[in-house]
């Protein structure tokens, strides 16, 4: 059994050692909740990794979006190359849930595009939890949605060993029961093929390698791993566990029992609808549910089977669904990254799902059991937590009030201080800002400006461009790839100034930025709350020459708290540096990473700019080959937005052939 072991040339420094000790001691003392209050650039991820190494427990890390989850996953893979680090996010590239609009009598069928690579990673994550303890799963908040029952999933897993008495046809029958398909032509993930006494399987958690089971009579003679593409043998196995092809797979006995319960719930609901004189709704419900029942009888599943998950799991009405968290052993550890953003997302998910289901049930599209195919309520989520560490530079009152231990991480390994904050009047703010921009550009640094409205951002960008300042504007309509391209161009000096509204907070760490300007800082509200201000100030904490200018006529409560907190941190950092003889230094990250991240965006733009009809067949083939290699690399690096963009371009080129 593997143990967590960090591989890094760095050792904990600054505030990291005491933060690690505090968190580890608190968790070992069986405290349920603790907070890691770490300033921007203090190495919170490295602290988390050290806590995991010291505690040696299976760990789930929650992030508030797919991009941040992918970034964290990459970092933890670097820290723990010899352990299992998995990625678990929603597998939908596109998802339109089924819905009904009574006003126009419009029913919208469920429509989804499933990303096969992410589905593979989800299966890889759940199967890893049954095989090892040195497992870290980085997940988005979608992990609080219902997943199949882990007990059923484990029960349906096929365990095969060399020397085991097992007939080939018996194994085939079991594979079909757990939703594998026989396909001798298109051999892909979740399928198997038969060749004489050999049975080839590509498990749900694999894609580029398969398992070959060789039989001698009614005995398993040999188990081998092979490369799906080349067919070459990769190694011998004594044992293999084949997990179900779907998390919602269920045994035949469970299905047969569930059908009777579904039929009973249908009859009860039909009586209710008929009593209310809702004859159309009753007819619709009877027709749709009977069709589902027939499909389940014949195939073992149906489209939308998750709406019957409560019955298939044998749960009582209103009880919480099984989720990824239930796949973990009891002593698991949870980190909630950027908890001030992630926890509100968890709170909001149930309400949105419930309002949509109400309409579907009221108008006869679904049985009431569909209500229980849902995300967890916040109280249910809390109950499922064993021990948790909230991670944030600006934890909310919930995290502070519920934590038995708060570990502050104020000192940065680089010795950098929190930026100096200057207050200037609103009158003449643009002229003053223009002067500060010129001073900053002369020193070779960049500027971030945050405004309150889209209109003001656009006008300011236009004004600065007219004055000859290389300025761009980042708004909410810009997709992930374009956003990364803008950041890359800012770092490379294509732009000197970036203007935005609420986009200059979490995750935008640019060492070249030496000035952050906050316009209309005294306008109280969401964009100028204490949390927002501290996060925005943090964008200037990667450069030793940085400062923040707030343009305001009054000092609001939020401003006052943000400034006092920043000054408190700055004083601690300054004192530490003086005592240890540390000179703050700007750590300039290699721009190569950013260039690699935006390479696809450039290739896509070049392709769109070219008239593909003018390309020769040879040129098209080369372009497809290059883009396919880039797409596979992007998927391997968990950069799925880039991979999807490339896939669409490749299809477009092929269609134009």
From Swiss-Prot:
It is found in: Cytoplasm. ATP binds at residues 38-45. GO terms for molecular function: ATP binding; ATP hydrolysis activity; DNA binding; excinuclease ABC activity; helicase activity. It comes from the Bacteria. SUPFAM superfamilies: C-terminal UvrC-binding domain of UvrB (SSF46600), P-loop containing nucleoside triphosphate hydrolases (SSF52540). The keyword Chaperone does not apply. A motif (Beta-hairpin) lies at residues 91-114. GO terms for biological process: nucleotide-excision repair; SOS response. It holds the Pfam family Helicase_C. Belongs to the UvrB family. Forms a heterotetramer with UvrA during the search for lesions. Interacts with UvrC in an incision complex. The UvrABC repair system catalyzes the recognition and processing of DNA lesions. A damage recognition complex composed of 2 UvrA and 2 UvrB subunits scans DNA for abnormalities. Upon binding of the UvrA(2)B(2) complex to a putative damaged site, the DNA wraps around one UvrB monomer. DNA wrap is dependent on ATP binding by UvrB and probably causes local melting of the DNA helix, facilitating insertion of UvrB beta-hairpin between the DNA strands. Then UvrB probes one DNA strand for the presence of a lesion. NCBIfam families: PRK05298.1, uvrb. This is UvrABC system protein B. It comes from Clostridium beijerinckii (strain ATCC 51743 / NCIMB 8052) (Clostridium acetobutylicum).
